[in-house]
Amino acid sequence: MPLNYQSGFGNACATEALPGALPQGRNSPQQCPYGLYAEQLSGTAFTAPRSENRRSWLYRIRPGVVHRPFEPYAGAPHWLADFGTGPVTPNQLRWSPLPLPATPTDFIDGVHTWGGNGGPDEQSGVGIHLYAANQSMKGRFFYNADAEMLLVPQLGRLRLATEMGLLDLEPLEIAVLPRGVRFRVELLDAEARGYLLENFGTALRPPELGPIGSNGLANARDFQTPVAWYEDVEGDFELIAKFTGGFWRAPLTHSPLDVVAWHGTHAPYKYDLRHFNTIGSISYDHPDPSIFTVLTSPSDTPGTANLDFAIFPPRILAMENTFRPPWFHRNIASEFMGLIQGVYDAKAEGFAPGGASLHNCMSGHGPDADTFEKASVADTSKAHYIRDTMAFMFETRRVIRPTRQALASAQLQGDYYQCWQDLKKHFNPEKA
């Protein structure tokens, strides 16, 4: 049965699973309805501007402080916080898809860190990961104190059971889990694989539209936030926390997903990438890829993001006398790309769904030789329909440091550079 959601981005939501569970006219009454506890979850400073402020009030069966002391957790062996301090290769890197696990593995233990920059101490930068799992989280829950988490499924459906309600997620949808929200990941199919980004910086939001106007790109109405849902379950559970890069576990005697009602702005949400209103040129030239931005995390430098999440969706190319694929590029920003389905229009082969590529600051990249030759002679008087595709990009202002396990991975394509070596010399000084 399909879940119900609240619609809109950044709304001050209010929802209750039992009638009258939300206090009226105040946040913390002397006694809450149904004998619940009031607890505030703050995602920004108390004094953050109203437009930036993220906080929610939760009305729950037990407050979040009810747990035994945390101890170090030895699991999540491939989820790393150390991106290294040594030299970073300027080479273009590409990986084949992460294999699905051969032994029982849930989401937390199935995360593999591929790179990142910054960290939670400075509240800036990103962690970039792949995940592969074949079982649901059983008897345990997780929260991330370090970062907001962006999930991009490539294979298999997920149910995110969170303190604030349920989110069902499938490939071509994304979800964002704010800092501190407790949850478990359930697999709705036998196997799951995808991408995970930790945003250590300012919370994600849709980009400003500027001269595009009041509509376009990811429209606010298409973001969906869960309605209140709870479980009142006692037993032996564990709560896993990610805190300053380390993993910790605390025993619980109850499920922490016991929020009966809540209101506020700090909440998980999902978005269907198929609703993205793609903007493009209807005259000439391929515009900058910033027009494909779904979500952005601003930095302290205006116009320069801590992170941009952009997609390259199905679209119609109508530009005339134009090289239509993405052009050759060297960028001050660093670009990590993934592919959810289909084929990326700048790479004829080698970039498979579930795979990834990394083009760091000023490392040249662009269409492969086959794509260039075909696009250079294509008939641009006719529109070209790109249908079977959904690529995405995590673009950051800082160099992305690939982890040792990513560089040592069997999925690293050592011959990636070869896709450009057949680009021919066409220069003829006698012919303009």
From Swiss-Prot:
EC number: 1.13.11.5
Keywords of this entry: Dioxygenase, Iron, Metal-binding, Oxidoreductase, Phenylalanine catabolism, Tyrosine catabolism
Pathway annotation: Amino-acid degradation; L-phenylalanine degradation; acetoacetate and fumarate from L-phenylalanine: step 4/6
Key word Oxidoreductase present: yes
Residues annotated to bind Fe cation: 329, 335, 365
Binding-site list for homogentisate: 344, 365
CDD domains: cupin_HGO_N
Keyword Metal-binding: yes
Catalytic activity, as annotated: homogentisate + O2 = 4-maleylacetoacetate + H(+)
Membrane spanning stretches: none
Catalytic center residues: 286 (proton acceptor)
MF terms (GO), sorted A to Z: homogentisate 1,2-dioxygenase activity; iron ion binding
InterPro entries, per the entry: HgmA_C (IPR046451), HgmA_N (IPR046452), Homogentis_dOase (IPR005708), Homogentis_dOase_bac (IPR022950), RmlC-like_jellyroll (IPR014710), RmlC_Cupin_sf (IPR011051)
Cofactor: Fe cation
Disulfide feature: none
GO BP annotations listed: L-phenylalanine catabolic process; tyrosine catabolic process
Job description of the protein: Involved in the catabolism of homogentisate (2,5-dihydroxyphenylacetate or 2,5-OH-PhAc), a central intermediate in the degradation of phenylalanine and tyrosine. Catalyzes the oxidative ring cleavage of the aromatic ring of homogentisate to yield maleylacetoacetate.
Assembly description: Hexamer; dimer of trimers.
NCBIfam families associated with the record: hmgA
Name of this protein: Homogentisate 1,2-dioxygenase
Lineage summary: Bacteria, Pseudomonadati, Pseudomonadota, Betaproteobacteria, Burkholderiales
The encoding gene: hmgA
